[in-house]
Amino acid sequence: KKLGIDLIWICPFYDSPMDDNGYDVRNFFEVSKDFGTLEDFKMILKRAQELNIKIILDFVLNHTSDEHPWFIESRSSIDNNKRDYYIWEQGKIKDGKEVPPTNWGSFFGGSAWEKDEITNMYYMKIFSNKMPDLNWSNAEVRNEMIKVGKWWLDLGVDGFRIDAVSHLDRAPFEDSKNGEGIVLDWHKFSNLPRVHEYLKEMNKELFSKYDVLAIEEV
């Protein structure tokens, strides 16, 4: 307070295997044991409110950890009711060999697809293999993430820094022509039209109901 601080942004502290500094969330409603407990956070939040200091949290919308219960269910079978929570596609045959559904590259290197041996299909992951991308075209996924946001806002946080928000939409699954082999063509999954649609929905169903701050990282 003496430093003139009036807002604190807390990076991901959710339960996580820590493959990517906590951005691989295993449970959105729990605090990682590396950082303490939910009760510890409530104490920090209470003290911050007493000092009139706002607290915002990182909110990861694009993906979860591959250890999240949704993904464990999703990968278990093609008929699971959470299958469409993530982006699954069949591989294709090229020169007599199976290859990923497209030649798109990941921000972290290699393909943007990872084959899962349980159902022999590929899930999309534009970051780490351990961070499967959520399927934002699925209304159930959007509703689930709105519930997550509501839970934290009801707890008393003052808003969110929304991580990697420009990547929530996907182009049709066709090979990039911007190079040979695996191609990091971010136009295939960044700044696409439905991102704005999803954010308008989130504003209507979540943010507009609270006096909070939402900062989108693009």
Per-segment meaning from a language model:
Residues 157:
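Conserved protein kinase catalytic-loop anchor
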Residues 8, 160-162:
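Hydrophobic residues within beta-strands of alpha/beta enzymes
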Residues 1-150, 154, 167-218:
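Acidic/aromatic-lined carbohydrate-recognition and catalytic surfaces
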